[in-house]
């Protein structure tokens, strides 16, 4: 086992604080509408330019093991804020730095670290309650656009695109962000259910020019296993032919004789038909087939449920207004399923999302929920260079999460003002002893940090701005760094999601409390590697007679 180095009390906390400062100083330059960019070196390709706090934090790894521990703890604050609310990572970092800095000073002055932490926790509870009280619910699409614009660092185009996307697919819908090929940022909305399986044979195509199969008002047969012969299906196929409506078969696979028979019937014009593979794999495939069945008002033909192919009747088939199948994907629009059944299925998936601990499962469940509930929107981010596209994509991602959070818990005045005015809620909070009161004071001072930093980044004195705002009793009154004007920020459209503000403060206080109460640190001593010995030049002696 390698030897360890141990640091105690003040020495340990000073090292931690140094690491916290290095990381926080790199992150906080990005805060606010006039925040600057940070350039991140990549081991391959062009450097990455970003204004996203968490991306900067993730890149930082310090040489000194003890300083690195402090930096990694604050990195945790940024990541947690990104996980919970999707934004507010820079605010969380600035708050954590402010609390740690004041806390370390107080501990050095002889206060009890545990009482300081308790005081900090008391203050945070009071502030969170106060912020929640002032939260306003979002009602209009314009307000959604404002949140998106602020979170994308004042980019109105991004705000509008996100608002349109949320209007189209609803709050449950999935919005994904991709890189576009061109210069423009555009929005693609897929209404209805789409899954990534295309037609099994190009002979099913109805529009040869576009190579798509369009089925109007088709019956939909959902089969869990492979179809290799159609003998068992003949009664139901005849019923479909008589109804003169098209048929879509979704099964694990359609092969051999079954596929050949369907193709021949399609070419002869006897039966308008198309076949696609079922989406997903294993248990997820079963669940997705069940989703499609509920959406289209049909039944999954499965031997687990005791339904055999030969017993299938036409009323077991689902229907939809229109189905479009390309080489890669299938879209079902306007399924005939019962609204109550669809809502019940959505509630069930929501419950599963709450219960799961796996990020991958959660993502897949959210996709399923979106396909059932609303649809899928894809924002394609364009730009002149790859570096610009990546930077913009980061901002769009942040903005998307922020708007989601805003719809969930409402909004408060932006620009760090919500936290600044929450200072007043601490007047009535008293700790059990003087040290806890100091903890409350630490939070009181830290709550000014975001406003000050936004002002500093805009080239104005932060202390002057914070002082001027605290003189005003209107809790929405703030400094608009974009225009340099003091005004009512909610009216000016400078708003932050309540969830983002709350998560930033709670995350920052949690980690800062742990850092303040640190009394010893243990890290591995890096082993000095000996320089490589020079190679032996023996054996070269026989070169004497070379006659140079």
Swiss-Prot record:
EC number(s) on file: 5.6.1.7
Disordered, as annotated region: 529-548
Family as reported in the entry's similarity comment: Belongs to the chaperonin (HSP60) family.
Subunit structure and binding partners: Forms a cylinder of 14 subunits composed of two heptameric rings stacked back-to-back. Interacts with the co-chaperonin GroES.
The protein's name: Chaperonin GroEL 2
A biological process from GO: protein refolding
Biased composition (Gly residues): 538-548
InterPro entries: Chaperonin_Cpn60_CS, Cpn60/GroEL, Cpn60/GroEL/TCP-1, GroEL-like_apical_dom_sf, GROEL-like_equatorial_sf, TCP-1-like_intermed_sf
Alphabetical list of NCBIfam families matching this protein: GroEL, PRK00013.1, PRK12849.1, PRK12850.1, PRK12851.1
Reaction(s) catalysed by this chain's protein: ATP + H2O + a folded polypeptide = ADP + phosphate + an unfolded polypeptide
Native species: Rhodospirillum rubrum (strain ATCC 11170 / ATH 1.1.1 / DSM 467 / LMG 4362 / NCIMB 8255 / S1)
Gene3D superfamilies found in the cross-reference section: GroEL, GroEL-like equatorial domain, TCP-1-like chaperonin intermediate domain
Main localization (coarse): cytoplasm
Role, per record: Together with its co-chaperonin GroES, plays an essential role in assisting protein folding. The GroEL-GroES system forms a nano-cage that allows encapsulation of the non-native substrate proteins and provides a physical environment optimized to promote and accelerate protein folding.
Binding site for ATP: 30-33, 51, 87-91, 415, 496
